Regions:
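Intrinsic structural disorder
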Residues: 1, 22-23, 31, 126, ...
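A generic secondary-structure micro-motif detector
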Residues: 4, 35-36, 170
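Active-site-proximal beta-strand elements of phosphoester/diester hydrolases
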Residues: 1-7, 176
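Active-site-adjacent "lid"/gating segments
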Residues: 68-71, 75-186
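Active-site beta-loop-alpha junctions enriched in small/polar residues
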Residues: 5-7, 62, 104
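CN hydrolase (nitrilase-like) catalytic-core segments centered on the catalytic cysteine
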Residues: 9-99
């Protein structure tokens, strides 16, 4: 599914309904000029939309060649999968760039199946979703061994960052403690 620029900035982006209709990869072709701080805002916006829609969200802004004396463009490109940044371009580069990432479509499908609110939203918007045309693609994989662009962590549920790991372990401890306390009070 494709959005154009500020489609993602509105209260109900078209990609939200597209995701409910089955789109798993959303591309935003943007001509959004750059201002101070907009880089971080785009990251937050794209991360949140990919997380809310349980999708891959590819955002690409016009590059420096579009710049004038009044406005500037940075050529920022981002690929997020369910709220996680997979790839990012360099900004303010005059040469053409290509960013590539492995998107785990099966993971996204699994997350959508497991997230009950996603299915509930689908039912709520059933009539609106009928307007979407579904185009299924069969991709033929190249033969031989394929190298992944993304790194798969040895322990994917254990953060490698020491501070984040300590925080996560603290949360696990608090959750288990609360559950045990509730059981003992019953």
């Amino acid at each position: 599914f494709a959005e154009i620029c500020e489609d993602v900035w509105v209260a109900l982006p078209p990609s939200t309904l597209a995701a409910l209709a089955g789109a798993s990869v959303i591309v935003n072709l943007s001509a959004s000029n750059i201002t101070v701080g907009k880089d971080e805002y785009r990251h937050a916006l794209t991360a949140n939309q990919s997380a809310r829609t349980l999708s891959a969200y590819v955002y690409t802004a016009a590059g420096p060649g579009e710049s004038t004396t009044d406005l500037a463009w940075d050529g920022q490109a981002l690929i997020y999968e369910n709220g996680t940044l997979l790839a990012e371009s360099r900004r303010f580069v005059w040469e053409p760039q290509l960013i590539v990432a492995d998107i785990d479509l099966e993971r996204l499908s699994q997350e959508r199946s497991r997230t009950t609110s996603f299915g509930a939203n689908r039912r709520v918007h059933r009539e609106q979703l009928k307007a979407f045309r579904r185009i299924c693609l069969e991709l033929e994989l190249p033969g031989g061994a394929l190298e992944l662009e993304r790194t798969v962590a040895r322990f994917p549920y254990v953060p490698s960052d020491r501070h984040l790991r300590a925080k996560r372990c603290g949360e696990v401890y608090a959750i288990q403690t609360q559950g045990l306390a509730k059981r003992l009070r019953s």
